[in-house]
Amino acid sequence: MSRPAQKRAFGVAAGLPEEVCGPLAAAVQDAGYDSIWANDHPFAKGLETLAEFAGAADDIDLGVAVIALDRQGADVIAEDIKRLDLDPARLWIGVGAGFSKKPLTFMTERISELREKLPGVRLVMAAMGPKMCALAGSSY
């Protein structure tokens, strides 16, 4: 039985200086990585970092993990993707409940909203615990 080729991802910290992103993205792509991922932080948006990588590495996917949906809703994420001219077909967006009071209810509502507002974007859900894992599994 043959196994599918292993995918390789490269992770960076959001907020890297612009002059670092282009050369690093090209090197990551040339090294055979399939995607570049950035974290998201209140003081450095992962999508903005990925936009710096997008032009220099046009053959690999771009991912951000994890955007706390209690800080940024689907409208803000969609606006950022449009403003930054990111191709939805290249994007992976990791999302989590953040510090919401009822995380299961919160994520149940937000996932359908995200799917509606972010067509073509691949979503992954941060899930800790059996109930959130079950929700993540039923959402995909």
List where the protein language model places each region.
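Glycine-centered structural positions embedded in regular secondary structure
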Residues: 25, 63-65, 137
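Internal, glycine-rich beta/alpha segment that forms the wall or movable "lid"
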Residues: 2-8, 73-140
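N-terminal beta1-alpha1-beta2 module of alpha/beta enzyme domains
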Residues: 1-61, 121
